[in-house]
Amino acid sequence: MIGRLRGVLIEKQAPEVLIDVNGVGYELQMPLTSFYELPEVNQPTTVYTHFVVREDAQLLYGFITKQERSLFRLLIKANGVGPKLALTILSGMTASEFVGCVERDDIVTLVKLPGVGKKTAERLLVEMRDKLKSLMEASVGSEREFVLQSNYSPAPTVNSAEEDAISALISLGYKPPQASKAVSAAYKEGMDSETLIKAALKSML
């Protein structure tokens, strides 16, 4: 099982990245909360991973912190939640924000995420409350907090910022018209694609 990768970031196009580890390129999918923490291309990076084996594919999911990976693993154990939906949830809010939703029984915020209907949100609140309690009791220090410290610095602006942002939102489950509208409303001159994605997601929650 692959639990961690340390190498050079070769490509990043939300939500996918390619990391070179001793000449071997590993493709990963990452929630946007972790994606924002990545360094620039051609810089060294370390990510914690979760490896999924299916009949038709072998998939790697990457996370900047162990805490976020732990939450991802709890989410995919919940009834009706697979890796794709778990990735979408953690792209729409940080781990600490999700924990806050569970603690407050905040179903309104959860149903705004693509793929999360009222029944799914209600089930998540019930199932995750006990799972998170058990995890917190077993953790110590910073692992109890589920707080993601951000050192993200926006990359230089690119001409295709809006197109990249729309594509990223669609890949997370948003419908094309919804993604396009959110990106257009959030866009400000000089924005790079990653900042634009974050702003568009925030406007929809």
From Swiss-Prot:
Residues 157-205 are annotated as: Domain III. One of its GO terms (biological process) is DNA recombination. It comes from the Bacteria. Residues 65-143 are annotated as: Domain II. SMART domains: HhH1. Keywords: Cytoplasm, DNA damage, DNA recombination, DNA repair, DNA-binding. Pfam families: HHH_5, RuvA_C, RuvA_N. InterPro entries: DNA_helicase_Holl-junc_RuvA_I, Hlx-hairpin-Hlx_DNA-bd_motif, NA-bd_OB-fold, RuvA, RuvA_2-like, RuvA_C, RuvA_C_sf. GO terms for cellular component: cytoplasm; Holliday junction helicase complex; Holliday junction resolvase complex. Coiled coil: none annotated. Has three domains with a flexible linker between the domains II and III and assumes an 'L' shape. Domain III is highly mobile and contacts RuvB. This is Holliday junction branch migration complex subunit RuvA. It comes from Shewanella sp. (strain ANA-3). The gene is ruvA.
